[in-house]
């Protein structure tokens, strides 16, 4: 009998494991935790193109964090309903809560909104119970937004049902959440249900793309219904148990929390099967702390030696535009009227009776139990009084956070900025029973709330809603718990905690997933799943057979090197295959970190290292330029780089005390805006290169980067002949011509900004950050890389400006190799199946540029989506040992069929060597294959390309062009922040507005933002060094 995976994939397998029907029948009535997981064998490629070009070197048995789900008992049809929740305000206005008008941003509001919608639907069910055939609420699968699903036949109501809900329809503890949708206690809610068609679970129509995607969504919603309570924080498919203690606490204002992600997918061949992937997650959260303690901590970070990249030690350069700058204002509100109702009530849910994390405050938040000392507040007052970078850095840290007003029973506000003025020098006109008079903010709080401010000289916190600004004393605010720390706001301490000791080993990882299935998802004896006919077949992970791919062959100048299979890191003393040839080197010593005599000696040493590696430097080291500069003098740095570029200096070597100081990003910014190559070394690195102890490895690492930055190539990647005495392929020369000759590789990566980029007309400035696109492309030889970055406005998945930048890549190849590529392989960082159509649109835009490149030009495109953040994990079937290298799968492990993307070939590949924690493999989906290469060929080609990384001499997790594109996107993000610091963006925006006055209206905000972003992109990247791996 055919193996289960063969049935799912619709292909045969040469290594079938028989399905044991008798055992399955015996286990039928056993709980899922007692049943064995089905054993899967890996079938061959579903692409019917050619035979396998590469032989199987070795295999290993693996397990994945995927679990089989039986859906054959689901009703034939699931009825879909459109749900409209309309807020009926006491002032007569009606607003549809699902249209985004009320959709406040932020994690706290997302949590509150989800619970409010859930309680509303539960109450609607109770009121319309007869029209739901008297069925329990378990027959409702609600996405807590605009869509409801029911098994066919359950609903017996009309084509439209309306229910009006008021405060009297909810228990007090539920109304507390429901009222937060409108933030007014006397509003009512009109809920409108409209049948909106069916979703099919069986037959051919069930396999149509739109139906298949929605059926997958139903399975996701049904299996997540038990998470709709206040015990869990949900963000997309990530869930974090609220009551669990934090995993760790990196500092006084942050904590690392453990959670999980769950993703469901249908099997490709139907058959009533689906798969659920469950993975662990960790995420940093802000602690429940006072705003003064938070700000004091950020002040300490700023003073603590610069903070390094990612911290707040460096000025983030954002303007504080939009803050209140006057001495008085008649229209400002100091009462926090936009906050929510407070209280310490309890409310019911699936478990009934737990306390809401956002409304129950600890004693430490009271005036008698402050979590900061008077000296902390005094130091903060002094720092703000000195101006400088304090306000800008703390404002950037606070901006966008939800904070609670302790004087308003925990009402929430969102921080927009920090005002220039404080509670003593900010006044407004107040009306009361004594008439109208001018009062300061400090006086107002004493009169209105009987609160005498202890620190009235701290700046006021501004919260903006629409065009109205409210001001709040800092000492009356607390950071609301349950908010994740965004990547761009993580301090170095938090970043270290996320990547170091918190990484779980595979053995522990597998156990954690089992705990999640049992304790959190509770998929056994689940009434929601029973109502929809969904059954978890086993809580044991599926077993598969993976291939171990051979490493690439590495060619240096004098020898060809074959890395060890599964342990591919390699070292060699051979010379670079293409050493750079340069004219002159310039040395800059920052902040007197080394003596001038030592700098001169370093020039001699560096000259020797260049000669040893075959790098030609025309000018003698005694003729190199050496300068001493202050690292904070950006003007002097800029002028020197311009002068040296005119003097034909090829590369600037900057020496600083720290490994990644502020000046590092300044150098990289001017590198792309001026066009002079740079490399930054720390004092310790220079000492190692000058001395003997431990210096060899340091010298090798530096020279590998140095050669690339100067235009050389360290080694070439080739298709191997044999590994471990076994032939890899029948003819590697034939495959070389097929897969590498006249083939260009291009990688695309997007780094999104903090929010969607639009033009905010009310403040006359950009709102949010642009996205940064990193692009890397290969030249004549596939390991010779060039690249660039550019900005685009919208925080969306689709690449923009391809008509300009795709031809740029191809023309660079032609200029270098004197011919156009006949095949172009594109590696595109991607998300899930739902985004494939947008990538296809990108492909069509690329095709439309062919004639622009050259009339009649028609190369074959191969487009591969790389999902680095895929939740799929691969472990050895038998995990043993204590080290990460023992417990993880080795480099080159490849699972050919991963069952999740309907109609596309895909594979999971782990290229990197795991050194810590659990390896995260990358999932690849072959979206376009004009060249008709087999999946066997593309699997091996992808692994070979990972060896192209020219610095570490071992493969990273993705192919070299994609790894380079990722680094370029990061570089572009840093450059944007530096650009904000040194360029008056307000002046740029005003000039663009003047030139595009026709765009100044609400409907054209995106077009105006695009014009501003294009201007910045040209200014930042106009002198990018072409056809060179300058970012190494």
Curated annotation (Swiss-Prot):
A cellular component annotation (GO) from this entry: nucleus
Consequences of knocking out this gene: Mortal germline (Mrt) phenotype in which there is a progressive decline in fertility with each generation at 25 degrees Celsius, and after 2 to 3 generations the brood size is 25% that of wild-type counterparts. Fertility in these mutants may be restored when transferred to a 20 degrees Celsius environment. Progressive decline in fertility is probably due to defects in gametogenesis causing a failure to produce mature oocytes or sperm. Defective RNAi inheritance. Abolishes RNAi-mediated recruitment of nrde-2 to germline pre-messenger RNAs.
Location of this chain's protein in the cell: Cytoplasm, Cytoplasmic ribonucleoprotein granule; Nucleus
Keywords, sorted A to Z: Cytoplasm, Nucleus
Family annotation (InterPro entries): HRDE1/NRDE-3-like_N, PAZ_dom, PAZ_dom_sf, Piwi, RNaseH-like_sf, RNaseH_sf
Residues in Piwi domain copies: 650-977
Gene3D superfamilies named in the record: 3.40.50.2300, paz domain (2.170.260.10), Ribonuclease H-like superfamily/Ribonuclease H (3.30.420.10)
Pfam families cross-referenced by the UniProt entry: HRDE1_NRDE3_N, PAZ, Piwi
GO molecular-function term, one example from the UniProt record: miRNA binding
Highest taxon, organism lineage: Eukaryota
Region feature Required to recruit the small-RNA amplification machinery to gene targets and promote gene silencing, mapped onto this chain: 1-551
Residue spans of biased composition, Basic and acidic residues class: 18-33, 315-335, 343-364
GO BP annotations listed: germ cell development; regulatory ncRNA-mediated post-transcriptional gene silencing
Region (Disordered): 1-51, 298-375
Ranges where the PAZ domain occurs: 376-481
Chief place where the protein resides: cytoplasm
Composition bias, Gly residues: 303-313
Expression (tissue specificity): Expressed in the nuclei of male and female germ cells.
Family statement: Belongs to the argonaute family. WAGO subfamily.
Function: Argonaute protein which is involved in the endogenous small interfering RNA (endo-siRNA) pathway and is required for RNA-mediated gene silencing (RNAi) in the germline. Interacts with secondary 22G-RNAs in an hrde-2-dependent manner; 22G-RNAs are RNA-dependent RNA polymerase-derived endo-siRNAs, typically 22 nucleotides in length with a 5'-guanosine residue. Plays a key role in transgenerational epigenetic inheritance and germline immortality.
Protein name: Argonaute protein hrde-1
Protein species of origin: Caenorhabditis elegans
Phylogenetic classification of the source organism: Eukaryota, Metazoa, Ecdysozoa, Nematoda, Chromadorea
């Amino acid at each position: 009998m055919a193996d289960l995976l063969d049935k799912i994939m619709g292909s045969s397998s040469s290594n079938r494991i028989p399905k044991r029907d008798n055992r399955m029948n015996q286990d039928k009535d056993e709980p899922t935790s007692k049943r064995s997981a089905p054993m899967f064998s890996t079938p061959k490629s579903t692409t019917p193109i050619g035979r396998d070009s590469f032989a199987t070197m070795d295999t290993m048995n693996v397990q994945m964090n995927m679990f089989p789900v039986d859906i054959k008992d689901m009703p034939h049809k699931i009825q879909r309903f459109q749900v409209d929740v309309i807020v009926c305000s006491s002032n007569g206005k009606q607003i549809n809560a699902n249209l985004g008008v009320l959709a406040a941003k932020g994690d706290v509001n997302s949590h509150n909104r989800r619970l409010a919608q859930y309680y509303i639907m539960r109450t609607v069910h109770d009121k319309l119970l007869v029209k739901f055939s008297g069925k329990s609420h378990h027959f409702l699968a609600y996405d807590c937004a605009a869509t409801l699903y029911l098994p066919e036949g359950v609903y017996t109501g009309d084509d439209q049902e309306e229910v009006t809900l008021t405060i009297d329809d909810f228990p007090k503890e539920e109304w507390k959440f429901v009222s937060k949708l409108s933030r007014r206690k006397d509003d009512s809610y009109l809920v409108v249900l409209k049948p909106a068609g069916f979703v099919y679970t069986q037959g051919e129509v069930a396999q149509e793309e739109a139906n298949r995607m929605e059926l997958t969504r139903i399975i996701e919603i049904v299996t997540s219904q038990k998470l709709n309570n206040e015990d869990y924080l949900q963000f997309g498919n990530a869930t974090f148990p609220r009551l669990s203690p934090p995993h760790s606490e990196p500092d006084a204002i942050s904590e690392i929390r453990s959670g999980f992600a769950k993703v469901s997918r249908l099997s490709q061949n139907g058959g009533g099967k689906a798969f659920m992937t469950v993975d662990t997650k960790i995420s940093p959260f802000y602690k429940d702390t006072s705003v003064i303690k938070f700000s004091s901590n950020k002040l300490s970070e700023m003073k603590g030696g610069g903070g390094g990249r990612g911290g707040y030690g460096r000025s983030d350069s954002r303007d504080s535009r939009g803050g209140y700058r006057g001495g008085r204002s008649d229209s400002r509100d100091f009462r926090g009227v936009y906050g929510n109702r407070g209280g310490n009530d309890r409310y019911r849910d699936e478990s009934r009776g737990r306390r809401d994390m956002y409304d129950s405050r600890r004693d430490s938040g009271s005036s008698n139990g402050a979590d900061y000392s008077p000296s902390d507040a005094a130091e903060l007052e002094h720092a703000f009084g000195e101006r400088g970078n304090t306000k800008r850095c703390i404002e950037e840290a606070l901006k966008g956070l939800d904070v609670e007003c302790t004087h308003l029973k925990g009402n929430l506000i969102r921080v927009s900025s920090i005002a220039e003025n404080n509670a003593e020098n900010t006044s407004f006109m107040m009306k009361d029973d004594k008439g109208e008079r001018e009062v300061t903010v400090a006086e107002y709080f004493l009169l209105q709330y009987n609160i005498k401010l202890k620190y009235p000289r701290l700046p006021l916190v501004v919260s903006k809603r629409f065009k109205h600004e409210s001001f709040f004393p800092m000492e009356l605010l607390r950071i609301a718990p349950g908010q994740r720390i965004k990547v761009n706001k993580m301090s170095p301490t938090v970043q270290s905690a996320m990547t170091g000791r918190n990484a779980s080993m595979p053995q522990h990882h597998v156990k954690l997933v089992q705990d999640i299935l049992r304790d959190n998802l509770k998929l056994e004896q689940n009434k929601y799943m029973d109502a929809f006919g969904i059954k978890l077949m086993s809580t044991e992970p599926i077993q598969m057979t993976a291939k171990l791919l051979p490493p690439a062959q590495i060619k240096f100048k004098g020898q060809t090197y074959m890395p060890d299979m599964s342990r591919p890191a390699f070292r060699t003393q051979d010379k670079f295959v293409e050493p750079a040839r340069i004219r002159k080197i310039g040395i800059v010593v920052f902040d007197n970190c080394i003596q001038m005599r030592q700098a001169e000696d370093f020039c001699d040493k560096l000259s020797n290292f260049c000669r040893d590696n075959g790098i030609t430097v025309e000018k003698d080291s005694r003729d190199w330029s050496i300068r001493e500069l202050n690292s904070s003098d950006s003007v002097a740095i800029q002028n020197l780089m311009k002068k040296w570029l005119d003097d034909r200096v090829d590369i600037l070597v900057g020496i600083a005390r720290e490994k990644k100081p502020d000046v590092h990003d300044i150098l990289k910014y001017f590198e792309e805006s001026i066009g002079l190559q740079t490399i930054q070394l720390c004092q310790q690195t220079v000492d190692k290169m000058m001395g003997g102890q431990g210096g060899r490895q340091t010298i090798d690492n530096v020279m590998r980067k140095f050669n690339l930055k100067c235009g050389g190539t360290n080694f070439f990647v080739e298709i191997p002949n044999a590994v471990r005495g076994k032939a890899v392929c029948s003819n590697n020369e034939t495959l070389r011509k097929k897969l590498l000759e006249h083939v260009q590789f291009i990688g695309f990566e997007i780094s999104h900004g903090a929010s969607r980029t639009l033009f905010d007309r009310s403040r006359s400035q950009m709102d949010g950050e642009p996205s940064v696109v990193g692009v890397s492309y290969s030249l004549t030889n596939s390991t010779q890389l060039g690249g660039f970055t550019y900005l685009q406005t919208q925080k969306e998945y689709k690449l923009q400006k391809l008509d300009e930048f795709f031809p740029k890549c191809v023309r660079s190849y032609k200029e270098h190799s004197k011919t156009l590529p006949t095949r172009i392989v594109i590696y595109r960082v991607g998300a899930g199946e739902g985004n494939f159509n947008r990538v296809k649109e990108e492909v069509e835009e690329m095709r439309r540029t062919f004639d622009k490149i050259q009339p009649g030009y028609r190369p074959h495109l191969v487009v591969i989506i790389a999902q680095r953040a895929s939740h799929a994990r691969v472990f050895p079937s038998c995990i043993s040992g204590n080290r990460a290298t023992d417990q993880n799968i080795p480099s080159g492990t490849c699972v050919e069929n991963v069952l999740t993307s309907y109609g596309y070939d895909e594979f999971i590949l782990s290229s990197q060597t795991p050194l810590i924690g659990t390896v995260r493999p990358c999932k690849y989906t072959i979206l376009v294959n004009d060249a008709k290469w087999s999946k066997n060929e593309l699997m091996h080609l992808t692994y070979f390309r990972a060896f192209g990384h020219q610095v570490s001499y071992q493969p990273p997790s993705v192919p070299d062009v994609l790894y380079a594109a990722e680094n370029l996107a990061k570089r572009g993000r840093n450059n944007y922040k530096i650009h904000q610091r040194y360029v008056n963006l307000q002046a740029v925006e005003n000039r663009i507005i003047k030139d595009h006055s026709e765009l100044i209206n609400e409907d054209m905000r995106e077009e105006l933002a695009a014009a501003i972003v294009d201007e910045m992109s040209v200014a930042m990247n106009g002198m990018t060094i072409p056809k060179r791996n300058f970012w190494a």
